[in-house]
């Protein structure tokens, strides 16, 4: 065992020749960044099993388990992008100067960057879920958080295998996503971890996974995302149903504090789409490219798809308070708050078999 401890996360891009072997019998060189949190755990001594929605979601999690190595057919060929495709970057002068080969390289790097953020985000979810197992105060919540921890481990495994065996290009975590995860992981308040992860991070991830699944031409990624989406839908539903009741028990000052945190996390999340490392890798003015991307119609449309998932859920749990309404309006995402939330459970949909039975 060899572990290198770093003060900050690595910023290097790992090209195919830089990636470690996906699986090795040799000694792995692990790279670890330490974070500290004044986390207070909680025993639960009555072990009362409430026959409620949380219990049903936990049972579904046990029933709908899947195996990354077995339930995804990895043998299908991978076909990377080989020709430029129409994209909003066509209107950006530095991109216009690229040859077709350079455009293809840029687009493949953008895809790899997005998939890398999925991987890093799922590791963050894994760490938060493990914290919630310890600090959630109720029996059902502990059991569900434990089952979610295993789900998140499976998602990390899936994205890691996909990147290392198919994309073969890995980017470091983006600064915006890292900032959100640092805040959630190091905060001592367990319910803030719930809000940050179950409502915002998981809600945004669910929307992003659904969009990626619709757009990808790779059947392996499509199948993999389909399985991950089933897990994530349960996670978001768990968070809303648990927090809706808990937030009511908080004082007005505590509710205000959580509402401000939710706003700040959403503000940072707008930057999750911006691949600053890719811009810098290709020698662009990163801030100029950032502004171009944020102002593009396709980015605004994608932001809408993402926050249509988050804003109604914040409203449902009582964190869309008067003090933050104007701030959300300035972000341009308040209008999505009246959409349908994920609190109303479609049990038939959540309970569907993972795989269609063959005739």
Where are these regions (language model features)?
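Amphipathic, well-ordered alpha-helical segments in soluble domains
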Residues: 121-128, 155, 201-208, 235
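A structural feature that tracks compact, well-ordered secondary-structure segments
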Residues: 126-132, 145-147, 206-212, 224-227, ...
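Short, solvent-exposed positions on alpha-helices
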Residues: 139, 143, 219-223, 237
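C-terminal helix-coil-helix/basic helical segment that borders enzyme active sites and/or dimer interfaces
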Residues: 243-251
């Amino acid at each position: 065992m060899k572990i290198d401890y770093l003060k900050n996360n690595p910023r290097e891009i790992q090209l195919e020749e830089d990636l470690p072997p996906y699986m090795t019998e040799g000694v792995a060189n692990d790279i670890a960044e330490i974070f500290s949190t004044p986390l207070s755990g909680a025993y639960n001594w009555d072990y009362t099993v409430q026959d409620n929605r949380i219990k049903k979601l936990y049972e579904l999690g046990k029933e709908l388990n899947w195996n990354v190595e077995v339930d995804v057919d990895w043998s299908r060929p991978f076909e990377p992008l080989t020709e430029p495709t129409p994209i909003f970057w066509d209107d950006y002068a530095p991109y216009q100067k690229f040859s077709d080969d350079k455009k293809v390289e840029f687009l493949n790097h953008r895809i790899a960057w997005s998939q890398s953020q999925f991987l890093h985000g799922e590791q963050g979810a894994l760490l938060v879920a493990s914290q919630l197992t310890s600090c959630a105060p109720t029996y059902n919540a502990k059991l569900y958080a434990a089952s979610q921890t295993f789900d998140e481990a499976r998602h990390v495994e899936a994205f890691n295998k996909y990147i290392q065996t198919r994309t073969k290009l890995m980017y470091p975590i983006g600064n915006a996503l890292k900032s959100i995860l640092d805040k959630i992981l190091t905060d001592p308040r367990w319910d803030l971890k719930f809000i940050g992860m179950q409502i915002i991070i998981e809600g945004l991830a669910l929307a992003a996974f659904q969009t990626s699944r619709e757009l990808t031409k790779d059947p392996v990624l499509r199948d993999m995302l389909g399985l991950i989406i089933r897990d994530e839908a349960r996670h978001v539903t768990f968070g809303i149903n648990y927090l809706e009741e808990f937030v009511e028990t908080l004082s007005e000052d505590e509710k205000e504090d959580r509402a401000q945190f939710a706003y700040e996390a959403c503000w940072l999340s707008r930057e999750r789409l911006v691949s600053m490392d890719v811009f810098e890798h290709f020698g662009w003015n990163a801030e100029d490219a950032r502004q171009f991307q944020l102002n593009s119609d396709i980015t605004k449309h994608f932001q809408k798809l993402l926050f249509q998932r988050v804003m109604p859920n914040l409203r449902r749990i009582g964190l869309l308070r008067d003090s933050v309404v104007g701030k959300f309006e300035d972000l341009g995402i308040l209008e999505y708050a009246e959409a349908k939330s994920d609190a109303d459970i479609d049990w038939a949909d959540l309970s569907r078999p993972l795989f269609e039975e063959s005739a």
